[in-house]
Amino acid sequence: MLSKKILVVEDSCHLRELLGKILTSRGWDPILAESGREALAKLECQPPRVILMDMRLPDISGFGLATILKKHPVHRSIPILAATASAGDLARQRCLSAGCDDFISKPFAISVLERRLTNLVSAETPKTIVVTGPRKCDPIGEKDSSDPGCW
């Protein structure tokens, strides 16, 4: 079984501790950091499988940290889920442009967070998809209305 180590970078002590407890109860192994600099130090000692990162941090912004990580020869392959109180297409685009792999708006449902994290770690392993003929597609039937990030 692959590691479920996750680096949670969140400056709010209450939210950081709460996320740590919830993620632990869901089978994840959280590493907690309150700042960008602390996150960089912890990455060197305990490389995670995925990063959940607030975009507003006290020292290095989440945008700056994502840019640093995506340029790093070792850490650039670690998926980053951006968490921000800003919502909408502009916020999403800004996070993705900085190098984040996905985006979630605060507040969020734990089930949505868990689904996003699972998708990110699953996406690490490339899968070959072979299409042998025309597919019937029902985009309305595939939509999960409980996911606010779903179009």
PLM feature segments, named:
Residues E10:
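Conserved acidic carboxylate
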Residues P47-L52, L57:
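Active-site beta3 strand of CheY-like receiver
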Residues R16, P58, R76, G88:
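The feature encodes the CheY-like receiver
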Residues E17-S25:
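Charged docking surfaces used in two-component/phosphorelay signaling
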